[in-house]
A protein has these predicted regions:
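N-terminal ligand-binding/catalytic initiation module
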Residues: 1-115, 124, 134, 305-308, ...
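Adenosine-phosphate binding glycine-rich loop
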Residues: 14-17, 235-329
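Short internal alpha-helix immediately C-terminal to a glycine-rich phosphate-binding loop
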Residues: 118-138, 145-157
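Nucleotide donor/acceptor-binding cores
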Residues: 134-136, 161, 222
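Conserved beta-strand elements of the Class I
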Residues: 138-139, 296
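Residues in the short beta-alpha loop(s) of Rossmann-like NAD(P)-binding domains
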Residues: 144, 168-169, 230
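NAD(P)-binding Rossmann-fold cofactor-contacting core
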Residues: 156-183
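Rossmann-like adenosine-cofactor binding region
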Residues: 185-269
């Protein structure tokens, strides 16, 4: 629940978010809001996301209202590809939470860390509800900033024994290898085709605009969490793979327009009705995986309600701990 403004504007910085919100808190918040969305108790507003034709940046807004949790707000931010050269994260964002009873700005929360951990929580929720319980090999496609968050969150969902990984820049793979070693998991850098042959669960977390995985490379029973496609034109996997899989998503409206399903839907090979909100599985309204041979795919487009959910948790914990700043507007 968003804090009230009677004591001024609450400000929770990036450092506090990292101290207060862990993987368990993020998982619970994201799973809860996905369930609320499927019940119709929470909804996202239309996304605004634009190439601003400056610094090669993408900038936009994601917002929504969770009536069940009484969380109202907006995340503002985007992607600046040159930031890492200046020691900054390429992803930059801030979350604004409003008092739903009055409309007053209540809380300002740093969104960079929370974006990474809520994205990882989303794929983790999909793994928990859709992957085979006997999954042993985790495949990672992408080794950027968010990849280590993804690996840590995924590793908590199944008894994985090995991580296989591919990245277009193989010199970045050691960051994943270090985390795998820390978690006691065998690590192997492989080709894309070999990754598909070995992995029981695959996470794609890239900014690709062409398929990195082809349908014929994926073995029966695999669960894929496609987490990088959040803009029109982006694509991480072959559209034929999307068509052959049982597809779940965070938000169907986004999946078919800016998500991994956009290409299959755009060609007429997949209908909107064939895509299921993962909240329906969480709520027990859909069985999820139907067999050990079924290929399941989670199209994680990233919705504003995820950001608001984890930001609300950060605000509550910071207020309880007395570690947030308060200012009067």
């Amino acid at each position: 629940m968003t804090s009230t403004t009677t004591e001024g504007l609450l400000i929770v910085g990036e450092d506090e978010c990292e101290k207060l919100v862990g993987r368990a808190e993020a998982f619970d918040a994201v799973e809860t809001v996905f369930a609320a969305m499927a019940r119709g108790d929470a909804y996202n507003f239309p996304v605004i996301r634009e190439a601003i034709e400056y610094a090669d940046a993408l900038y936009g807004f994601k917002s929504g209202f969770d009536r069940a949790g009484k969380v109202l707000g907006v995340k503002s931010g985007g992607y600046w590809p040159g930031n890492m050269d200046n020691g900054l994260s390429n992803h930059q964002s801030t979350v604004f939470l409003f008092d739903p009873d009055t409309g007053k700005l209540a809380t300002l929360v740093g969104g960079n860390y929370l974006t990474a951990i809520r994205t990882a929580a989303s794929s983790a929720v999909s793994i928990a509800h859709l992957s085979r319980k006997d999954a042993k090999v985790l495949g990672m496609v992408g080794a950027g900033h968010q990849s280590t968050f993804q690996l840590r969150a995924a590793a908590e969902q199944r008894d994985f024994e090995k991580v296989v990984a591919w990245n277009p820049h193989p010199e970045m793979l050691p960051r994943l290898e270090a985390v795998a070693s820390e978690l006691g998991l065998e690590f192997q850098g492989v080709s894309q085709e070999e990754l598909g042959a070995q992995a029981d669960v695959i996470i794609t977390i890239t900014s690709a605009f062409e398929p990195l995985l082809m349908s014929e490379w994926i073995k029966p029973g695999t669960h894929l969490a496609c987490m990088g496609t959040d803009t029109k034109g982006k694509q991480e996997v072959d559209a034929k793979l999307v068509v052959s899989a049982t597809v779940f998503t965070d938000e169907v409206a986004q999946s078919v327009t800016i998500g991994e399903a956009q290409h299959a839907v755009g060609s007429g090979a997949l209908s909107d009705d064939a895509i299921t909100p993962i909240g329906a599985v969480i709520n027990g309204e859909h069985p999820g995986r139907s067999s050990a041979e079924e290929i399941t795919l989670f199209d994680g487009t990233g919705v504003g309600l995820q950001d608001l959910a984890v930001a609300s948790v950060a605000a509550q914990l910071a207020a309880q701990a007395g570690t947030a700043q308060r200012v009067l507007l």
